[in-house]
Amino acid sequence: MFLADHPFADRSNSTSNTLGTDNPWANQIVPFNACAFFVTSRPTRHYLLSIALLLLLPEFIWGNEATKPAPSYANGAPVDSNGVFTNDKGDIAHGSASVRVPFMLRRFGTYLRSDKGAPEQIQDAAAQLQANIQAGQPAVTWVGHSTTLVQIDGINFLTDPIWSKRPSPVPLLGPRRYVAPGITLEDLPVIDFVVISHNHYDHLDLPTLVALAKKNPQTVFFVPMGNGKLLRENGITEVVELDWGQTTAYKNLTVHCLPSQHWSKRTLTDTNKTLWASWAVTGGERRVYYAGDSGYFPGFTEIGRQLGPFDLVIVPIGAYAPRAMMLESHMNPEEAFDAASDLGASKALGVHFGTFDLSDEPLAEPPQRFLNTGSSATAAAPTPWIFKIGETRSF
């Protein structure tokens, strides 16, 4: 693929060294204060503001009904007639109001929801990781949610790192974290680079990214088109933006920016103005694919044909219920296993479940269904992997 013109993104693949603004959180969300203008009582104003925040939070994770016209594009990631990114099939549906409104109301109850079924956490995670580092084996560690630490060819990289307690524009609100990160930031090895799939708060966690950049200023952050501005404005300097179909070298590895079927939104006014993506990292030692967030789509087969087979495929298996709302943007466990098969995976690691309360399915359901699907598959199918939080395995 070649690059396509896009009004919201500088479609270059060079590393930017532009420093951010004086305020490290300058671009965080502040669209909720309108109601406060009309309220003079401070307690009442705070109460109404809290209610508004709670009602609007789901919009930053699950979005709204697709209304944009069919895509018009030639090269790179599709761009629709409104000048925003879209998918190969056009805009994806997010369910009718009759599905979405009850779903959002149910999210209020999750503040009291039990953590029964949340993933177990191993007790010796740091020691296990350190032992593997000393052994020098290709390995993957599940930190939690979609965050993994991958070690291949002497390189350490992270996928969608989030160490925050809540994926939210407001630290005290949003889905709570059931299980702490399996590895502390302090126990991480030197991180060479990070891949970000899209700008939703459970995947692009600014506090974590800033902390990683401060810990090692040489860490490179690979992001889909349009996402670099937010990082640079928060003081992260080593940022590389890529379009679908673009590749770049990192030492002895090749980093591939690839399609996924999803969407983006971080404020009330920026829907699909930044790109979403999946990633492949290939080298002489191992080939790894990270799906990010995605509905099941034909692109998996094409990626597998062009770049597979993969030694490890990391696929999201949670946040799929209700299906009327999630079908086109989040795979269920069976679809995730099929995607790994399409990609030519040897090992398929299920992630994106059990860490945050994002959807209606029981916390323990995604890994059970994923393993059940794998156990009934043919011998040539991928081996399904479900980790405890903090677990490391070589591959």
Annotate each language-model stretch with its function.
Residues 148-151, 249-311, 327, 331-334:
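Catalytic core of the metallo-beta-lactamase
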Residues 161-180, 263-271, 321-330, 357:
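Acidic/histidine-rich helix-loop elements
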Residues 23, 27, 31, 46-50, 116-135, 224-286, 369-391, ...:
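Metallo-beta-lactamase
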Residues 77, 100, 173-223, 238, ...:
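Active-site metal-binding motif and surrounding structural segment of the metallo-beta-lactamase
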Residues 59, 64-67, 73-80, 87-88, ...:
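Cap/insert and terminal regions of metallo-dependent hydrolase folds
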Residues 5-6, 10-13, 17, 22-23, ...:
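Intrinsic-disorder-associated, low-complexity terminal segments enriched in Asp/Asn/His/Tyr and depleted
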